[in-house]
Swiss-Prot record:
Keywords: Amidation, Cleavage on pair of basic residues, Hormone, Secreted, Signal. It comes from Cyprinus carpio. The keyword Amino-acid biosynthesis does not apply. Urotensin is found in the teleost caudal neurosecretory system. It has a suggested role in osmoregulation and as a corticotropin-releasing factor. The non-hormonal portion of this precursor may be a urotensin binding protein, urophysin. This is UI. One of its GO terms (cellular component) is extracellular region.
Length: 145
């Protein structure tokens, strides 16, 4: 390796290992939460589904606001591990994915098409089995005589 790239690599590694993690995080989380609330409220659109999702997200953020204020800024270890989030965050991720799940609307036409196709295939399979069973009975009757 040439000396210039080696020196640049060495300095970048040394600089990144000595940066405290607190400098990479916002100092005031309430500012970030209020901006997120504004984005959610203004960008939700007029659709009923987007309104419901925005409402659920707003409830979720308000519910977790107390935990963020009480906990302050998270202090992570200097070397991050594979598991950075707590089990409580797993539950919150499940709640967020629950918001995006499909509701109980009637199925769309493509779903109906595939449902009908599956039913037709199953009916054809059952018919083939009945025909094969009839042929097997006929052969057994012939051989049994």
């Amino acid at each position: 390796m040439k000396p210039v790239p080696l020196v640049l690599l060495l300095t970048s590694v040394l600089l990144t290992t000595h940066i405290p993690l607190s400098t990479c995080r916002p100092r005031d989380l309430s500012l970030m939460n209020s901006q997120l609330d504004d984005v959610l409220l203004n960008g939700a659109g007029d659709g009923a589904m987007s309104y419901l999702v925005g409402e659920k997200l707003l409830q979720y953020l308000q519910r977790n606001l107390g935990a963020q204020k009480a906990g302050g800024v998270l202090h992570l270890p200097h070397f991050p591990t594979a598991q950075l989030h707590s089990p409580h965050e797993d539950n919150s991720l499940e709640e967020l994915t629950e918001f995006s799940k499909r509701n109980d609307d009637p199925p769309i036409s493509i779903d109906l098409t595939f449902h009908l196709l599956r039913n037709m295939i199953e009916m054809a399979r059952n018919e083939n089995q009945r025909e094969q069973a009839g042929l097997n009975r006929k052969y057994l009757d012939e051989v049994g005589k």
